[in-house]
Swiss-Prot record:
The modification N6-carboxylysine is found at residue 191. The active site is at residues 165, 284. The record marks 324 as: Transition state stabilizer. Substrate binds at residues 113, 163, 167, 285, 317, 369. GO terms for cellular component: chloroplast. This is Ribulose bisphosphate carboxylase large chain. Its EC number is 4.1.1.39. Heterohexadecamer of 8 large chains and 8 small chains; disulfide-linked. The disulfide link is formed within the large subunit homodimers. HAMAP family: RuBisCO_L_type1 (MF_01338). It comes from Nepenthes alata. One of its GO terms (biological process) is reductive pentose-phosphate cycle. The keyword Plastid applies.
């Protein structure tokens, strides 16, 4: 029997509504917007084909392998409520399509060429189910939440951070001075801005040295373990590891990486180095909005968060929720749980399309940062709980009396909120009152309350279910 050449509909091979998914399959939920005249089944099947074994025409080499064993399958399609001509297409991928321990390879297949496919007007990857059989091939975060708490000897409260501003232009010595003031005032961490790498006004080695001096001085004065996220992101992997090695030689606890601009291969290499050498790894998500902001095209952040948990990181930025709409709060808390918890049930109201079981992969601390200040502290404490990092950049450095009083104000506000919560008070209802009470005995907090009492960031939610 000769092989039959020609073009045939994808749905004849790749749309299989009777397929029962296997425990080892990687499952994907795509939001598909077909071109006019393309039926949803054909669009869903095209996604399955182009992200696995298919191409646009029948090829004779198909006969040299078992397509049934290796092909992706679109096994279910449902219309998106309230949207015209949008569908959720569920696709199952056999595990053997992917290299073990490689987020890079997984994404190259699942979100590769298929996103430029002409039969689709738009395509968004909403969620991925990573099976234990695949996640066990990854190291995951270098240390995880519990090990980090033990290293820092800090329990029972969120951790406090601050991004040093202005983000660009400070000399290394002035940068170190700003770090020292913040840590002395009561913060647990300070942070390199994501754009700070090794520029002419501040080379990385100078910054690392002045920062280490600030760290040891602040630790000696406060009796607490302190950290500064030293950004090791660089133009090459070799240079990145060189910076991490120098950080380790200085004896500091944590380094940082921009995982999307740096790339998953570099990130996974750095995560392995950090575990082997006892360094915590803070992850910034610069560039995420390019990928996840459009609601009908791209990749949802919950997928990027899962990918980071596989690739490795101990902290990752995760938005703030505060001052946004309720719908966004549920979606944000959905991926915060996917970062922290071992087992997360499917819950479409929070945007979670699949039950996710992480088995032995450690959890990641979500970092709330961006436009937050002391008046937000009760809401942040309630929403994110103890296992989080609350990061106030302008909300520390913008204090009228300087960095250290700004840090004091944040620490006092946090301790007051944690104590009130532990006493059974309702932070959502009594939050402002709790902050006012605390400001009576902390002049630093009173000054912060006064300067930021009118500031609000209220916009429509971009991300809806």
């Amino acid at each position: 029997v000769g092989f039959k050449a020609g073009v045939k509909d994808y749905k004849l091979t790749y749309y299989t509504p009777d397929y029962e998914t296997l425990d080892t399959d990687i499952l994907a939920a795509f939001r598909v917007t077909p071109q006019p005249g393309v039926p949803p089944e054909e669009a869903g099947a095209a996604v399955a084909a182009e992200s696995s074994t298919g191409t646009w025409t029948t090829v004779w080499t198909d006969g040299l392998t078992s397509l049934d064993r290796y092909k992706g399958r679109c096994y279910h399609i449902e219309p998106v409520a309230g949207e015209e001509n949008q569908y959720i297409a569920y696709v199952a991928y056999p595990l053997d399509l992917f290299e073990e321990g490689s987020v890079t390879n997984m994404f190259t297949s699942i979100v590769g060429n298929v996103f430029g496919f002409k039969a689709l007007r738009a395509l968004r990857l909403e969620d991925l189910r990573i099976p234990p059989a695949y996640s066990k091939t990854f190291q995951g975060p270098p240390h995880g939440i519990q090990v980090e708490r033990d290293k820092l000897n800090k329990y029972g409260r969120p951790l406090l951070g601050c991004t040093i501003k202005p983000k660009l232009g400070l000399s290394a010595k002035n940068y170190g001075r700003a770090v020292y003031e913040c840590l002395r005032g009561g913060l647990d961490f300070t942070k390199d801005d994501e754009n700070v790498n090794s520029q002419p006004f501040m080379r990385w080695r100078d910054r690392f040295v002045f920062f280490a001096e600030a760290l040891y001085k602040a630790q000696a004065e406060t009796g607490e373990i302190k950290g500064h996220y030293l950004n090791a992101t660089a133009g090459t992997c070799e240079e990145m590891i060189k910076r991490a090695v120098f950080a380790r030689e200085l004896g500091v606890p944590i380094v940082m990486h921009d995982y999307l601009t740096g790339g998953f291969t570099a990130n996974t290499s750095l995560a392995h180095y950090c575990r082997d050498n006892g360094l915590l790894l803070h992850i910034h998500r610069a560039m995420h909005a390019v990928i996840d902001r459009q609601k009908n095209h791209g990749i949802h952040f919950r997928v990027l968060a899962k990918a980071l948990r596989l690739s490795g990181g101990d902290h990752i930025h995760a938005g703030t929720v505060v001052g946004k709409l309720e719908g966004e709060r549920d979606i944000t808390l959905g991926f915060v749980d996917l970062l922290r918890d071992d087992y997360v049930e499917k819950d479409r109201s929070r945007g979670i399309y699949f039950t996710q079981f992480w088995v032995s992969i450690p959890g990641v601390l979500p970092v709330a940062s961006g436009g937050i200040h002391v008046w937000h502290m009760p809401a942040l404490t309630e929403i994110f709980g103890d296992d989080s990092v609350l990061q106030f950049g302008g909300g520390t450095l913008g204090h009228p009396w300087g960095n250290a009083p700004g840090a004091v104000a944040n620490r006092v506000a946090l301790e007051a909120c944690v104590q009130a919560r532990n006493e059974g008070r309702d932070l959502a209802r009594e939050g402002n009152e709790i902050i006012r009470e605390a400001s009576k005995w902390s002049t630093e907090l009173a000054a912060a309350c006064e300067i930021w009492k009118e500031i609000k960031f209220v916009f429509e939610a971009m991300d809806t279910l």
